[in-house]
Amino acid sequence: MVGLGVFARKFFGSAHERRLKVLRKKAEQINVLEEQFQKLSDTQLCKKTDEFRKRLVEGETVDLLLPEAFATVREAAKRVYDMRPFDVQLIGGMVLHDCGIAEMRTGEGKTLMATLPIYLNALEGKGVHVVTVNDYLANRDAETMGKIFGFLGLTTGVILHDLDSDARRAAYACDITYATNNELGFDYLRDNMAFDRSQMVQRGHHYAIVDEVDSILIDEARTPLIISGPLEDRTDFYNLIDTFIPALTPEDYEIDEKQKTTTFTEVGTEKIEKMLEQAGHLKGESLYDIENVAIVHHINNALKAHKLFVRDKDYIVRNGEIVIIDEFTGRMMPGRRYSEGLHQALEAKEHVAIQPENQTLASITFQNYFRMYRKLSGMTGTAITEAEEFSNIYGLDVIEVPTNLPIQRRDEDDEIYRTAEEKYRAIVRDIRQAHEKRQPILVGTTSIEKSEQLAERLRKEGITNFRVLNARYHEQEAYIIAQAGVPGAVTIATNMAGRGTDIQLGGNIEMRIRQELQDMPEGLERTAKIEEIKKDVKQLKEKALAAGGLYVIATERHESRRIDNQLRGRSGRQGDPGRSKFFLSLQDDLMRIFGSNRMDGMLQKLGLKENEAIIHPWINKAIEKAQKKVEARNFEIRKNLLKYDDVMNDQRKVIFEQRMEIMNAEDLTEMILEMRNEVVEDLVETYIPSGTYCEKWDITALQEELHQLFNLELPIETWAKEDGIAEEQILERISNAVTKLENERIERFSPEVMAYFHKAVLLETIDTLWREHLVHLDHLRSVVGFRGYAQRDPLNEYKTESFELFQAMLRNLRRIVTSKLMRFEIIQQPIEPRIPEQTDVGDPILNDQNKKNSSTLWTPSQENKFVNPKDRNPSDSTTWGKVGRNERCPCGSEKKYKHCHGAFV
């Protein structure tokens, strides 16, 4: 059978080859249209957009429009930028349109390629999201590619970190929106915490193209997006615990670098117990008594912070704050914080201000966020090694798009040394040799610390003309990358994965124009200078080519082969020559943690001397085996995370859909009535179980519950003494009494007031209980793994118990909402004749009547002066001034003020 399979592949081609053959035929159809579209005027070409939209309305599909739409974009790109998408870019665009992942080598024009499917799918008017890894790339691509879309009559928006809600809403309303994965995810979570539909910014999830798709959907898949709020301040306790760790010795704890965990030994536990006892914080006799659970958590975090997390590798200290470094891209991630007290432990370790711990308010993983899109696709330079994961988790096929020109880069064999010192001596020697012939060099390191150590070595060797690109200097990233291809340039970079910028030999013309001519106005002089820059870059490129092209030197193998391939792929863009080489040592993290312990002995037996390298197929296979082992482990972690998050995701969908229904509903009376009836039925069933005798009824408890929930005093004891009374009759009487009380409240407060309160109480209660539920799920997730020791499947246990917690939350929701709506009171504040002082009371706060003060709804006070209606902001009541009771409400509801916002004043 194997022989037949091999024969079939040779005869018919692989599935990948057959797919490319079909796509090439489609590309030919587009090429046939090129001459026809060249003859169109700019106006005629622009009108194609309206023509395509009309045809879609009449029933045509985007698939049928593809050849003409792609031909339109190709012609627009030629006219706007004098850039013509190659056939391979047409193929890549079709892969993206068909919900696939296009693997294209660095420098092959992914950004321009993406304009083809973006335009085609934007014609439907449902929004296209283009996802990038950072704000710089989102802004750059929106600005440059937006000119092509603008030429064709489409609107382009960009979401940046510091935009307010109105600007975000406007950007999402555009035909095409560029944004980072983080901003998209957080906007989705914030939308599902909004009080009103008008506060939401996104408009759905129709089609997304993810740039650097492997970085976002693979590398970052393990990290959930979390919106959190502060808990109590425990600064002193964190500082105290932090003082314990330096007193420990290596025999007091164990570190598993492979699993990234730390544990105390028996000796270490005894030491910690003594220190806690002296500080007066040990409860009970043992550290592991139930009363000390929180303390154990803090101590484990402190140990992890000191022994597992390395400054300038995992994080940096910047402006008195701990800033996390992305392990895959080497970029800083400002605003991101480790959860569960780990970030506070790092702050205590580095003696910076400790921020309060946070409580999760809402969370989602990128895996579940991006699976919400009706159409999803991606592009990257390296995806084949992760093809199985893309297919299993996202249902995306990876297609390797051919290069426009053959690759001329020479990938040399790895050089393996016994020690890191020998390795770095060899790297410096190689850099010197290449630098002397003016070959541009890119050196890839795995951490800030190692990049700066290498920089210091180069200085000592007299090589000073180099640049360092790491998280410390990320603001200069674009410029450093742009100049990395200049002859004689030496660039030391931390993790080139996901940089999104290719290195052009001779330098980047656009960057030089921006840098050198930023203050020069348009005119003949500027045009002449631009021509000079172009000529200079051309000459520099010729020199770089003569020196052998870009030389990529890697100082370590990464855990993932894909990251190594990304670094290699920086050389040899668009058919340019180049070379790459990896320098390794047995002291590298990958070799030390995952490699074979016998490798060092084997090298010694082979007679390896100091400063000698070994190049052997057996060594290369061992390295690849170690990398595959790590990749498999990380894949399992991500799959496992998804299984657990899928459980929460099902519950999240229910809650978010319920919130959306409440926000959109004009009348929630039926929902409230249904909740109230279920609460009454549950109460009666609990204290007067069906089919039981009166002697078994707990009348006292039922009366207490009715008083607590509804503020009702009913003669249930008297009813229970009636001859032949049944639980159904008592249920009916209680229901009638509750309905009567509710009707009285409606008469007192008007339907508008009740509608507002129904919505406010429902949303506020759902949000509060959902936050608490997330905490419960976090706790359950952290301990459920131990069920495996009892021969029970942790995942099944998690599913069962999380469902029970969810059902309990829904029951609690019904009780709390019913109780609040049956007990609230409004205190009307009389308007004094004098102009009151301005008071910023904030958002409405609903207090429970059982508290010291009676229940009160507060709203921002209105300043007692008249304001021109044109100057009033409908969404900001503080700008309305004095509003007449019979005027139309400034909010835009078309109701009279006294029946709308004026009802609360």
Curated annotation (Swiss-Prot):
Its main location: membrane. The keyword Nucleus does not apply. SUPFAM superfamilies: Helical scaffold and wing domains of SecA (SSF81886), P-loop containing nucleoside triphosphate hydrolases (SSF52540), Pre-protein crosslinking domain of SecA (SSF81767). It comes from the Bacteria. Residues 837-885 are annotated as: Disordered. GO terms for biological process: intracellular protein transmembrane transport; protein import; protein targeting; protein transport by the Sec complex. Monomer and homodimer. Part of the essential Sec protein translocation apparatus which comprises SecA, SecYEG and auxiliary proteins SecDF-YajC and YidC. This is Protein translocase subunit SecA.
